[in-house]
């Protein structure tokens, strides 16, 4: 078929395939542009390339990793002040605290006065102002996941 032999002597099949590929390339370019536009708009207000989104459920820490992973995200781990502000804005809107993960080599932290205090628990939660507190991993807090897009 590709060489236009007796099965498709006029090359109609090949021409149809070429047209289909070109149409799919245009559609892909349009979808990519739309996606990047929405992402840039969502991150513009927060100044962060990371998006923090809630499903409005409250859960303890145990299922959080799986919930976020299934959604294509991860447990929040703000690495910069603007990321922490974006995370805190979600908490403020819902007037609830949420879990976060603090890496061992974190360059940015936002511990509240007197924190971390392992007597309060081994997990970390952020309040509606974005301050971090030690917490029990059994507390039911707002489910928030972090999504990071490499542009």
Curated annotation (Swiss-Prot):
Glycosylation sites: 107
Residue ranges occupied by any C-type lectin domain in the UniProt entry: 31-146
Disulfide bond found in the keyword field: yes
Cystine pairings recorded for this chain: 68-145, 123-137
Signal peptide: 1-4
Protein location: Secreted
Any single Gene Ontology cellular-component annotation: extracellular region
GO molecular function: carbohydrate binding; phospholipase A2 inhibitor activity
Highest taxon of source: Eukaryota
Tissue: Expressed by the liver.
Keyword entries, A-Z: Calcium, Disulfide bond, Glycoprotein, Lectin, Phospholipase A2 inhibitor, Secreted, Signal
InterPro entries named in the record: C-type_lectin-like (IPR001304), C-type_lectin-like/link_sf (IPR016186), C-type_lectin_CS (IPR018378), CTDL_fold (IPR016187)
Protein role: Inhibits enzymatic, anticoagulant, edema formation, myotoxicity activities induced by snakes phospholipase A2. Is oligomeric, but it is probable that each of its subunits can bind and inactive a PLA2 molecule.
Family: Belongs to the alpha-type phospholipase A2 inhibitor family.
Quaternary data: Oligomer.
Protein name, as recorded: Phospholipase A2 inhibitor BjussuMIP
